[in-house]
Amino acid sequence: MEILNQFSQFSPNMEAQGASSIPQPSQDAHEKARQQAENQETAKNGMISQILDQAAMQRLSNLAVAKPEKAQMVEAALINMARRGQLSGKMTDDGLKALMERVSAQTQKATSVKFDRRRNELDSDEELDL
């Protein structure tokens, strides 16, 4: 019975409406999510500006332009260090360099080149009948 009641609520020209009758996520929800992300970004930037001195902020900005993923990792490490109380005062440029080197060492991928020489197939002695 409940299903029949739901169908009776639909208008007879429902088929003509097509996709417009499908409930869409409200624009308010998208706006709210965007606003929340913007607030989190602002809070993160505020924390980082309190953690780093001017030279270190400039270096982090340069890193964010060149390698955004690595900059996000460094920012996360800085915020975690600040929350744990591992930082005393503002971090200098040298301290940021050391942190960047540690993050790079942890995330560095080992690249290797492997040559697969097929000696049996490319043996030139067989071709020359020596």
UniProtKB/Swiss-Prot annotation:
GO terms for cellular component: cytosol; nucleus. The lineage of its organism: Eukaryota, Metazoa, Ecdysozoa, Nematoda, Chromadorea. Residues 27-51 form a coiled coil. One of its GO terms (molecular function) is DNA binding. Belongs to the PDCD5 family. Residues 1-46, 103-130 are annotated as: Disordered. This is Uncharacterized protein D2005.3. Keywords: Coiled coil. It comes from Caenorhabditis elegans. Residues 1-27, 36-46 have a biased composition (Polar residues).
